[in-house]
Structure formats: C-alpha cells, structure tokens
Amino acid sequence: MGIKVYKPTTNGRRNMTSLDFAEITTSTPEKSLLVSLKNKAGRNNNGRITVRHQGGGHKRHYRVIDFKRNKDNVEAVVKTIEYDPNRTANIALVHYTDGVKAYIIAPKGLEVGQRIISGPEADIKIGNALPLANIPVGTVIHNIEMKPGKGGELVRAAGASAQVLGQEGKYVLVRLQSGEVRMILGTCRATIGSVGNEQQSLVNIGKAGRNRWKGVRPTVRGSVMNPNDHPHGGGEGKAPVGRKAPSTPWGKPALGLKTRNKKAKSDKLIIRRRNEK
C-alpha cells in the first residue's frame, strides 16, 4: 500500500499524507460480523474520565475478528481485504468450506483467492495458523497467543512481526517487535507472516481536525493549567514545575518511573528485556 501526498492547497494540506488504500478490495463490510459500538468518550460507568484525550470522532461499527484461529483442518478462501477503523492493520474476510465467514488480521502478502488453514499440521505459509511448537526456528509470525485457546494478544498492529528463536522444553523462545525475548507455551498458536499495512506509521496527519475525526482530543500541557487541575499549574507567567521531578496530573512521578509489578509471575518467562542492549 502506497503513500498519497497532497498538494499544499491550504496550510492544513501542506505536508499531509494518507494511504492510497490500493490493497483494499471492498468498502462494504460483512453485515453478519458487525457489532454496534457506543462512543464512551473515555468515561467509565460513573461518567468519570478514565482515559484522557478521547471523544467525538466518526461513528463506527466493531468488526468481530477471529483471533483464536481454532477451526482446525477446515480450509478457507480469502474473499476481501478491508479497512478496519478500529485498528491500524487491515482485515481479511475469509469463507470456510463449511459455510462459516470470519474476519482475520490481514498479513503482508495475503491476496484475494488465496487459501488458508489452521491446525497443527498446517503448512508454513502466510496466513496459516498453528501451534508455536510446530513452527520452525526463524519463522516470522504475528497474532500470538499468551494462553492456549485465549486468542492472539501479541503482535497485531500494522507492520508488526515477531520471530521464533528456538525451543526449550514445553516453551518456545520468541523475539517480539520491541526486542524483548520471552518464553511462550508451545501449545499457544500464532499466524505465519508479518502484519500488513506496514506503511501506516509513515502517514503525516497534517492537521488537528483529522485527529478529531478519529476521536482524539487535544493534549494540554500541565504548566498552562490552574494549580487545582495539575501539579505543574499556577504561577506567574512561564513558571517552572516547582517540584523535584515532573508529575502526572494525579501527583505521581512522570518520565521514567517503572510501573510494572515487581512480583509479576511472568518475569521468569522474560529472557531479555526490551530495553536491554
């Protein structure tokens, strides 16, 4: 998928780019796989903001994605490659030979008419899903399960990929996109190939209004707020923070504080941290 560059007809259009959507084969989604999606604008059930900078944006339907890929030994044909407003990756509509329809994350190189299959004996081909223990060392994978049968949780964003490094007993060593190397149970499933739409990260938004279409609201600096709104607020003119270190709006240390649970049981499964050189 290529990048479309706009002419600088206005200040907002200057340097603006977008995807050309050349890979998209249809603009009409499969109706049976759509679910209504209510705009919560970052609020919880008490009406309080729990996620800032969310609200507005275009109405969307949620596309039900098959992250489990547990329909073993039933072949499916790729019918369409579609845009999904709820994620950076594109999705593919597949029709199984038994009549079931499903959406999957569209890997790079997947084409309409291609046949895919899931199961322990599936071939190592783009779009096929199988247990990690059955995938050869060096294979590029995505949509990786953390727990058997739960569905893919890792490596689902546009352009993301991971690689199988080896096997130790019942665990498989996987290098993730961040550089982290961790052990995952060999019975967990993954899909062959990297996620498509890899040029999505190169798009220049160009103007604030385009982010508002996506439901992203402005981010305001704490230093320009009032002292009752943010620890950095108040003072006369451009005042400094007034603390030992920058803080979050809730008074906790910002910039570099480790938030991971020090007693996390999964620590023993992480062989190499993402920030280790």
UniProtKB/Swiss-Prot annotation:
One annotated GO biological process: cytoplasmic translation
Region Disordered: start-end pairs: 218-277
Gene3D superfamilies in the cross-refs: 2.30.30.30, Nucleic acid-binding proteins, Ribosomal protein L2, domain 3
InterPro entries, per the entry: NA-bd_OB-fold, Rib_uL2_dom2, Ribosomal_uL2, Ribosomal_uL2_bac/org-type, Ribosomal_uL2_C, Ribosomal_uL2_CS, Ribosomal_uL2_dom3, Ribosomal_uL2_RNA-bd_dom
Molecular functions per Gene Ontology: rRNA binding; structural constituent of ribosome; transferase activity
GO cellular component terms given for this protein: large ribosomal subunit
A Pfam family that the UniProt record links to this protein: Ribosomal_L2
Coiled coil spans: none
UniProt xrefs under SMART domains: Ribosomal_L2 (SM01383), Ribosomal_L2_C (SM01382)
Protein keywords: Ribonucleoprotein, Ribosomal protein, RNA-binding, rRNA-binding
The UniProt record lists the keyword Protease: no
Record carries keyword Ribonucleoprotein: yes
SUPFAM superfamilies documented for this protein: Nucleic acid-binding proteins, Translation proteins SH3-like domain
Quaternary state and interactors: Part of the 50S ribosomal subunit. Forms a bridge to the 30S subunit in the 70S ribosome.
Biological role: One of the primary rRNA binding proteins. Required for association of the 30S and 50S subunits to form the 70S ribosome, for tRNA binding and peptide bond formation. It has been suggested to have peptidyltransferase activity; this is somewhat controversial. Makes several contacts with the 16S rRNA in the 70S ribosome.
Protein name: Large ribosomal subunit protein uL2
Native source organism of the sequence: Streptococcus uberis (strain ATCC BAA-854 / 0140J)
Taxonomic lineage of the native organism: Bacteria, Bacillati, Bacillota, Bacilli, Lactobacillales
UniProt gene name: rplB
